């Protein structure tokens, strides 16, 4: 269980239904405190456009669903039913599936809020990336609904004067929508609390001053709240250097991680392959390059093309989900690589090609024409391509091509080329809507072909626009699968793609455009969901559960005691003994500045 952000501490059943219907998809779920039985909980699950509510009892000894399996923690119960599909059923036998956690909204859009992060993970982050005075705020895993301020207190060499841990954790209590650190002033928001203690540092009982000098920012974001993150990233810096603000800072941090991705590119550097590279230093990584298998055995380099396979690597809880969409990122064809391009398309069974450049831009060749004229047929080495039809849309041209191998009869495959024509020669499009409509069409076409191989994406070098299109598409696929309330991480996604082809997403403008495109997609999706929900009925009342387990012995049905222990996430058990600073005993000290 990597997160328990599915726990919503302050919502009613009606609010849960509204959240699941407007933000979730079928299979989305959340847990919340029971309003009818204080101390108990309720599991709310979206199924076929409606919401089912399931009661969870806490006897003081264990958690269960009024019968069936028993668990030590709420997190273990949820994890069990997520991983064991078919175990949770209604009386009529219908299966209730927990697929996608619907995350609780972040309490702040500030980038120092990291959401779900364990104490150890916070210490690792602050130790590796922070310095003296670096801080972050995270959710408390041992006390759902509360938060923790983690501060690096050691010097920049990683050691504090008295040998204590170089990271201090301070519990932030949240009650009645007010925040405090266990005594003293209460604040209306986490931001107000942090700003106060930045100006008025806390002092530990042993005298260590907790100075909040610089935030350690996160790049993770709840997709539904991307507008707030974009607003934060768009703020000008507080210094006189007005250029170095959020987007620049995030992109520059990403650029500094390039040294971690220096994989070998020996095949592209071979003398025999140099004329197959459009740009002599933009070469494919060896470990992900597309290797052509049907070349001339007398020509040892006939297996080379400047192209890499891109495999998205994001979690999925759905054990029976279909394989994820993959991509081939490649350069624009040269005159001497067109034959190899079609060999690759045929070998990989690619059915969709995305071209994001014009043939010539600013007087320079970006990609030679690798397809025949409309209604024409042309042979490219051992491959034969027939252009059946071309149709023009607002921003792109769609070409229906028939691909076959010479000498293999009339067996043809349909390949669809989507040629995006309106990317400006300089910068990025001013409106992401055209790109999103284009990618939506590409997505539907790829989904409609059951055995389709990777989507081939190219521009000129095969890294800038190509990387931008692929990253946007990957992020949108995550949102499609998990709903608008899932977590996304733009820099992490780019880093993942860059680990498979170097230099993907080239400029800060392209980086910013990715955020703008995802924001536009979310806003459009939310409007559509809201319109759909206006005509739908509300969710069901509580359902009776039937278990498919062989052991269906009922648990103790005694009334719940008025006070029940706070559930603890299983991965935090070893951390439960960690001593939080008793900030009620801390003294406030005026700023040293």
UniProtKB/Swiss-Prot annotation:
The gene is PTPN11. Residues 548-575 are annotated as: Disordered. Substrate binds at residues 425, 459-465, 506. Gene3D superfamilies: Protein tyrosine phosphatase superfamily, SH2 domain. SUPFAM superfamilies: (Phosphotyrosine protein) phosphatases II, SH2 domain. PANTHER family: TYROSINE-PROTEIN PHOSPHATASE NON-RECEPTOR TYPE 11. Its main location: cytoplasm. Signal peptide: none annotated. InterPro entries: Prot-tyrosine_phosphatase-like, PTP_cat, SH2, SH2_dom_sf, Tyr_Pase_AS, Tyr_Pase_cat, Tyr_Pase_dom, Tyr_Pase_non-rcpt_typ-6/11. Expressed in embryonic fibroblast, hematopoietic, erythroid, myeloid and lymphoid cells. Belongs to the protein-tyrosine phosphatase family. Non-receptor class 2 subfamily. Phosphorylated by tyrosine-protein kinases. This is Tyrosine-protein phosphatase non-receptor type 11. It is found in: Cytoplasm. Residues 548-557 have a biased composition (Polar residues). This PTPase activity may directly link growth factor receptors and other signaling proteins through protein-tyrosine phosphorylation. The SH2 regions may interact with other cellular components to modulate its own phosphatase activity against interacting substrates. May play a positive role during the stages of erythroid cell proliferation.
């Amino acid at each position: 269980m990597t997160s328990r952000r599915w726990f919503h501490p302050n919502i009613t059943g009606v609010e849960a239904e509204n959240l699941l219907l407007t933000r979730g998809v079928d299979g989305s779920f959340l847990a919340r405190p029971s309003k009818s039985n204080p101390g108990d909980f309720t599991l709310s699950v979206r199924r076929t456009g409606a919401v089912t509510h399931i009661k969870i009892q806490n006897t003081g000894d264990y958690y269960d669903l009024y019968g069936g399996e028993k668990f030590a923690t709420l997190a273990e119960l949820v994890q069990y039913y997520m991983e064991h599909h078919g175990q949770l059923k209604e009386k009529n036998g219908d299966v209730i599936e927990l697929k996608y956690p619907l995350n609780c909204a972040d309490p702040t859009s500030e980038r120092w809020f990291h959401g779900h992060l364990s104490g150890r993970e916070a210490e690792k982050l602050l130790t590796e990336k922070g310095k003296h005075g670096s801080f972050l705020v995270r959710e408390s895993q041992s006390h759902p609904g509360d938060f923790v301020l983690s501060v690096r207190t050691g010097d920049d060499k990683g050691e504090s004067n008295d040998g204590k841990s170089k990271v201090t954790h301070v519990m932030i209590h949240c009650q009645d929508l007010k925040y405090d650190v266990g005594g003293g002033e209460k604040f209306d928001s986490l931001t107000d609390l942090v700003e106060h203690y930045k100006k008025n540092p806390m002092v530990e009982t042993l005298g260590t001053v907790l100075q909040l000098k610089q935030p350690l920012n996160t790049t993770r974001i709840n997709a539904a709240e991307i507008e707030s993150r974009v607003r934060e990233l768009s703020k000008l810096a507080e210094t006189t250097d007005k250029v170095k603000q959020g987007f620049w800072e995030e992109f520059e941090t990403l650029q500094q991680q390039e040294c971690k991705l220096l994989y070998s590119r020996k095949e592209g550097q071979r003398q025999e392959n140099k004329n197959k590279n459009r740009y002599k230093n933009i070469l494919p990584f060896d470990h992900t390059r597309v290797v052509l298998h049907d070349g001339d055995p007398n020509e040892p380099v006939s297996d080379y093309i400047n192209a890499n396979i891109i495999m998205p690597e994001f979690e999925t809880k759905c054990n029976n989900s279909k394989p994820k969409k993959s991509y081939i990122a490649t350069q624009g064809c040269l005159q001497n690589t067109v034959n190899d391009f079609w060999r690759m398309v045929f070998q990989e069974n690619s059915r969709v090609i995305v071209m994001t450049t014009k043939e010539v831009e600013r007087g320079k060749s970006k990609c030679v024409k690798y397809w025949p004229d409309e209604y024409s047929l042309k042979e490219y080495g051992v491959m034969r391509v027939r252009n059946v039809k071309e149709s023009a849309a607002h921003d792109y041209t769609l070409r229906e091509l028939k691909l076959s191998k010479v000498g293999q009869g009339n067996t043809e495959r349909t390949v669809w080329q989507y040629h995006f024509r309106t990317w400006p020669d300089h910068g990025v499009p001013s409106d992401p809507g055209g790109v999103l409509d284009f990618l939506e069409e590409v997505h539907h076409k790829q989904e409609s072909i059951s055995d389709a191989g990777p989507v081939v994406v190219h521009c000129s070098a095969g890294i800038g626009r190509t990387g931008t299109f692929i990253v946007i598409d990957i992020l949108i696929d995550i949102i499609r699968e998990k709903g608008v309330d899932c977590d996304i991480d733009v820099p992490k996604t780019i880093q993942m793609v860059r680990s498979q082809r170097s230099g993907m997403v080239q400029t800060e403008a392209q980086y910013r455009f990715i955020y703008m495109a995802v924001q536009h997609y979310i806003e459009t999706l939310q409007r559509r969901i809201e319109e759909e929900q206006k005509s739908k009925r509300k969710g069901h009342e509580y359902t009776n559960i039937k278990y498919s387990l062989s052991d269906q012995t009922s648990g103790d049905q005694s009334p719940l005691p008025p006070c029940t222990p706070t559930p603890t996430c299983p991965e935090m058990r070893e951390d439960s003994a960690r001593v939080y600073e008793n900030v009620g005993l801390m003294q406030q000290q005026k700023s040293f500045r």
